[in-house]
Amino acid sequence: MLKYFRWIFRYYRTHRLHTVFLALLTLISATVALAFPLVFRYLLDNVQEVLAPGSEDRFLKLLLALGAVGFARMVAGFYPGARAWLNSKIGMEVRDDAFGEILKKDYRFFSKFGPGDLSTRLTDDIVEYPRIAWFSCSGIFRAVESASRLVFCLGVMVFMSAELTLLSLVPLPIMLWIFYRTERKLGKRVEESRKATSSTSDLLDSTFAGIAIIKAYRAEKGQSGRLRRLLDSRLAIDLSITKLVMVIESLYSILGEVGKVTVLFLGGLFVIRDRISIGDLYAFYVYLDMLLAPMIDIPNLFVTSKQAFASIDRVREVMDFPPAPERSGVRKLGSVDSVEFRNAGFRYPGCDAGVIGVTGRFESPMTVAVVGEVGSGKSTLVKMLSGQLPCTEGDILVNGIPLMEVDPSDLSLVTGYVPQESSLFSDSVGENVRLGRGMEDQTVERALALADLPAGDLPEGLETKLGQGGSGVSGGQKQRVAIARALAGDPGLCLFDDCTAALDADLEQRLWDGLRAEGGRRLIFVVTHREATVRQSDLVIFLHRGILNAIGTHEELLRTNEVYRLVLATEMS
């Protein structure tokens, strides 16, 4: 348990003053709760003396005491708001830290955690009651306040009547037994609930991402059935948690009421026998009533802690996942004059898939087509060249420098990458092209024109808004925005992963014509399944079953390589 509190307390360090302020409000709140019954105890026991003629000073002091207690209660009223503020701040910082750590991960991480699961961990696990944000401040400080009230109230009650205090606390051992019996079962149910939530998010994410396929195959009923089964399972788990919590709270309330009835009955006898005063009985009853909330709050801390700790484990699981290997290269490129593969290869962990044995040297300016059947390692090869995947064997050199020795930031400056799926964001076309690089409008417009998507053809120019995933424009326009993003930085190395697949023949031809007309020294690697695209290239890298089969011009390979001809005939359009 201590490891969780150490993890939480590190967020307190950035809010020391606010934490001290909360501690002060906690003390004020507990003190006010303690003082109020004592003032009325005094009033009940001394009402005749206070109201008697000539006792104006005593009456004035009593009014001042009541005023002070009232003012203190007003100050203590800021307590929930102060807790809520720190809840929000901690939630924001935890999410920011987790998101920053996620951005440092590599392919191993994203093959293990799906988008829906990650979204759940960064939202529900952090901000939903009673998860990390609420528990880190409100949960802990409420427990501290309740513990303070418990200690203070019990102290005063023992001072007034130790015997009556002992009798009123008879239900306490039963409460502890209930907590012990339910604590482990509740923790197990909470973990099951979090996993069910992540599974639901994953299903929704994959459904919305592939909605076109689902509609095309009329698979709506199948997806609805999967969701219904997941929700039924999740509902059963959540109901079991709710039942456990209801049983705990109900039993605690009943036992608390038993204690109050005991005080009224036995306390009345004590008053009749002059063992305590009527003011003592009033104060005693109020203190016991005040104890009921702490006696629920403190066990509730353990209940909510199970849920919060499960969420902390889930957030820490993604934060503590090993990051991508540190690339400590510092060498600069400036431009890209050549790329050389030296028996380069990459194998995905736990399987033989990937690409191996790639050897060849390519000099700028040149267009290189990467060709092969589905699953031959084409996309893997360009991801290796972009630095997304490390070479597990051999090496890749840029300008004669091993890729691992190149400054990663410098490599990104000279590289333009277009993935198979045009990943666009819910923002304007201009911001999608800039991608935080602070480019002038003229630079963005030039890149769009080069991708054959002039800004003037868009409804609102650069400010044209795109929906989720680039919705609102055609598939060809989305791909051209992605190409413009890659070209906007004037890269010397362009990596196009089947990016012309969504373009018709005329659009693709205009793209290549525009790149040639612009001139400049560019080394372009383009993964393609189109023979028309291959014809635009100077050289072809032909991969077959994950191994380099041949390198040559399209005409040479057609003439000399039977496997190439077969793949061209069966896999390419």
What are these regions (language model features)?
Residues T14, H18-T31, K61, A65, ...:
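Transmembrane helices of ABC transporter permease
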Residues A196, A219, K243, L291-V318:
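Cytosolic ends of transmembrane helices, especially the final helix of ABC transmembrane type-1 domains
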Residues A65-A76, L172-Y180, V245-G259, I278-N300:
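Hydrophobic alpha-helical segments in the permease module
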Residues G334-S573:
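ABC-type nucleotide-binding domain
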Residues Y4, Y12, Y79, R83-A84, ...:
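Juxtamembrane loop-to-helix connectors within ABC transporter transmembrane domains
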Residues R10-L17, Y107-R108, D124-I140, K185-D202, ...:
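An intracellular "coupling" helix at the cytosolic face of ABC transporter transmembrane type-1 domains
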Residues S88, D96-I126, D202-R226, E317-S328, ...:
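Short intracellular "coupling" helices and adjacent cytoplasmic loop segments at the cytosolic face
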Residues M1-A33, Q48-L66, Y79-R83, N87, ...:
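Membrane-integrated ABC transporters
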